[in-house]
Regions:
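Walker A (P-loop) phosphate-binding motif
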Residues: 21-47
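A glycine- and Lys/Arg-enriched "phosphate-lid" helix/loop adjacent to the NTP-binding pocket
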Residues: 121-196
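Conserved nucleotide-binding/hydrolysis micro-motifs of P-loop NTPases
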Residues: 64-66, 118-119, 153-159, 215-216
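NTP-dependent small-molecule kinase module
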Residues: 2-19, 47, 163-254
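ATP-dependent small-molecule kinase phosphotransfer cores
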Residues: 51-143
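Hydrophobic residues at beta-strand termini and immediately following loops
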Residues: 60, 151, 210
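Hydrophobic "anchor" residues on beta-strands that sit immediately upstream
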Residues: 28-31, 111, 148
């Protein structure tokens, strides 16, 4: 019988056995935060440190699927995305990367660092007026990171860091939903909504909050400490369905 036809119960058992066993396993670590929060800088420093310590590290970035990204880019260029379409396409991009990059790397015991994960979609889409439960369903079966670092900054800090060197684009500034013509003014209004959603998500999903206003070195050393503590956490039972579905669809004989 082909792997894709294996009973879901059997695939769930394989997932539990693979990720719940003894020894070093793959870890998924997400870096989240509003634009200008400093998360990308910290993600790069953290990856360099992990590799120097002997870890095999894979990085995945938001909106980077070779299959879906060109579609999103073309639709953004002509400003033809409704909030619902924006959400659906980014969820499709996310799912493609989970199936082709994230889960294969985790299965092979690598550390996956995600520069933005599903929480970016939740925060931005709800800030655009969509229902949280509706958006969550787009990302099912849900795959939860082992660690989520949320880099908290104020709307003023985010706006200052982003707009000092460039002008936010149409969707980045939220002009599709704010009805504010000035991109800088629109960005400030929109990022307030995004940060408000992030703060709620950080509580609900038990993210680890990092003060993005602190010096870069202080933040980095804090991440090291948290990683040493968090890497010993047991594998989350929540992820069984996501892994089982991937095993069924991929048919890779793992």
């Amino acid at each position: 019988m082909p792997q894709s036809a294996a009973p879901l119960r059997q695939l769930r058992h394989r997932a539990r056995r693979h990720f719940g066993g003894a020894g070093r396993r793959g870890l998924l670590i997400a870096f989240e935060g509003a634009d200008g929060s400093g998360k990308t800088t910290q993600r790069k420093l953290f990856k360099t440190w992990l590799k120097a310590d002997g870890y095999d590290v894979v990085t995945t970035k938001w909106n980077s699927s070779d299959l879906i990204k060109p579609i999103i880019k073309s639709r953004k260029t002509v400003q033809a995305l409704s909030p619902e379409e924006f959400s659906l396409l980014h969820a499709a991009d996310f799912r493609h990367r989970v199936e082709h990059t994230v889960l294969p790397a985790l299965w092979d015991g690598q550390i996956v660092i995600a520069d933005r994960f599903l929480f970016t979609g939740l925060a931005r889409d709800v800030a655009r007026g969509l229902d949280l439960d509706w958006v969550l369903k787009l990302y099912q079966p849900l795959l939860w990171p082992d660690l989520v670092f949320y880099f908290a900054v104020t709307p003023d800090t985010s706006s200052r860091r982003v707009t000092t060197t460039r002008t936010p684009n149409f969707y980045e500034s939220g002009r599709d939903v704010t009805d504010i013509a000035d991109p800088v003014e629109s960005y400030y209004t929109f990022v307030q909504r995004v940060i408000r959603e992030y703060e709620s998500l950080a509580i609900v999903f038990n993210m680890t909050t990092i003060d993005g206003e602190l010096p870069i070195a202080d933040q980095h050393h804090r991440l090291r400490e948290l990683f040493r503590e968090g890497q010993t956490r047991p594998w989350s039972e929540w992820n069984v369905d996501a892994v089982a579905e991937w095993l069924a669809v991929s048919g890779n004989g793992r």
